[in-house]
Amino acid sequence: MKKTLSLFIALLAAIAVSAQDVSIEFITPRIVHIVKGKPTKSLVVTAQKQDVPLVKKPGSISSSELTVRLNEKTGCVTFLTRKGKLLLREKSHDVSKVQQTFTLDKGEAVYGLGTFQNGKMNRRGEKKRMEQSNLEDFQSVLQSIKGWGLYWENYSPTVFEDNADGMSFTSEAGEGIDYYFMWGGSADGVIAQMRQLTGDVPMFPLWTYGFWQSKERYKSSRELLAVVDKYRELQVPLDGIIQDWQYWGSNYLWNAMDFLTEDFSNGRRMIDEVHRKNAHFMISIWASFGPMTQQFRELDAKGLLLPIETWPQSGLTFWPPRMEYPSGVKVYDAFSSEARDIYWKYLKRLYSYGTDAWWMDSTDPDFFNPRESDYTHPVTGGTWRSLRNAFPLATVRGVYEAQRKEADNKKRVFIMTRSSFAGQQHYGSNMWSGDVASSWDMLRKQVPAGLSFSLTGNPNFNTDIGGFFCGSYNTMGGGSAPRNPQYQELFVRWMQYGLFCPVFRSHGADAPREIWQFGKKGEPVYDAIEKQIRLRYRFIPYLYSTAWQVTTNNASYLRPLFSDFASDAAVWDMTDEFMFGSSILAAPVLEAQYTKEQIIREDAMTGWDKKEVKAESPQGAIDWSAQKSVKKYLPKGAEWYDFWTGARYKGGQWLTITTQLDRVPMFVRAGSILPFAPEMQYVGEKDWSSLELRVYPGADASFTLYEDEGDGYNYEKGICSEIPMTWNDRSRTLTIGGRKGQFPGMLSQRTFTVILPDGKSQTVSYSGEEVRCKM
């Protein structure tokens, strides 16, 4: 039975809709598709419409979860729960525009839309023109503290505005209003609905949860390999090494997708060496090509290049750019399946060398000095304007789908991308927040930016640890920022935020960022950095098990506090604390405590005023051992343990916490089980035959330890294992349940050491059968 209502059969009651068609279609009992005019040809939606039982009455239609009403005079739609609770309603609008206005409750908080770099969570009172860029990425997905979500299905630049007249979306192109309303009941519930609509999240390789080192850029294979060697010599953990741009040589050969300089004379051998050192290799690729590349010539001959001005603008590699020598670099039409096939045909060469992961830079793409003729230029399926914001989705999807089709593919696709659009979580990508400035203000902005991004349904977010542009700290000469105490403190605190991101990656320009640039072992800054890296590796069983929950149960890594504590209004706009998975409350220090923080300007390309920074540079040694303090909030509805001290606190209170340089404040929710791995130099150096299980009493708890082969897609066939664990708080008993499933290389025997916050511990042997541990 068709579930679409239109002007012609509207609710079987001949409702007039002011000369416009209104289509109301239930995709699932909790997802409703609204169209006025012509629908968008979707690049995002993957869900198949379910056969949803409906109850129709004059002026309304209901599923088991939602009721939708249609005003017969105005054509406006209202959404309610099946029990009649008002969720959201439309207002009348100008039918000559691709625009819809909605009425929100007074004080109703709304979230999402992507990575706004304004330091806010709640979107009330904001006006923003949403067009993909380096620093801000937009997914037209919004959700409310009331538990509903909305996906605006339009790919053109769109203005979001909330004011006294209502909340509206106004798009620059389109033939109709097209959006999906979702009822989730909570933040996690809305995310689950969005993924049901646009696709689930595939697993990433286990090794990607280790530490990554990068910089702009390693200038030879010798330099890159020496970095891996140095980490191994220092016995500091490392899993990923990244080669940034220009390994191809001239800008006229931009993105040739091959090693074309003497400094990278044998790319395959270099990658083999990385693998022999038990590390993995990621390489930078772009969505544009220089005029001397094979890709440019083939795409140009087929009319599959765009005329927009992009990076690099100069054909010379000098800085600043010499514009009298234009590069001729052009962006490819990623909306064309033929163009995407050509892209992979040449990228496959790097894949054949053994590349483990892709760094898809400038997937926005860079778009300078835009002209009206650029926006009206035809691309496959529309115009540049009509499809503009979906470009990152199209190019990332092309690489993901092509690699998945490779017959010998034993590697999970891992793509790091600078931009993202709705539904991109389905295509093996993790988005970083762009070329952010190295400042405390920008660090503070990354927390709400990452949370807002996660609320759109894509859980995979990271940042350039330390910020990309740190040149203002080079007060003692070129590349000296890591010796500047102001930058040292910022870098350590950024590392502590990065500890909680799905990808833990140090990168940037203006100065190298390897750990030894900041000092040597035994010195406070070096030791603080090393401590964060080592802690990350201990967290990996928790992280990887969370990844499984992300894939199978629509969980998230970075979760705003209102995800679990929506009844506590104090956390509705919390921008400096968040949940890391389901159990850990991360409360990183986001202000300078040992050095001065005077911000002169916030321009992402220049950062701080260099003269002022030099004047502010501390004179004399910094006492990094001094204890400081910071105020943090513990939400109502749970009790909390200080991760470091084991002290227990009630929720609903502000605490003044003693801090030190090498510790990031964090708390564990009472009623949690956390698995900890042994220390290791790289993922896989040691197996998980001996794990710690830290149990935090105060409530019943459950956790599922997930394991598989660590790479490849056999998990999609059920080749993996789960070990369920439960804590009964009344009996103080931990039950480690019988293992479910198996995979090649699975451990047959292991030990778990159960540890309580008061230090009591007990070690148990486990061979796959249920065991109980009474504490």
Each language-model region and where it sits:
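Catalytic core of carbohydrate-active enzymes
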Residues: 401-405, 413, 420-431, 453-463, ...
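Beta-sheet entry/capping signal
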Residues: 21, 31, 67, 140-141, ...
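Short, solvent-exposed loop/turn segments at the edges of secondary structure
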Residues: 72-74, 134-136, 145, 174-176, ...
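Short, acidic/polar
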Residues: 220-233, 340-348
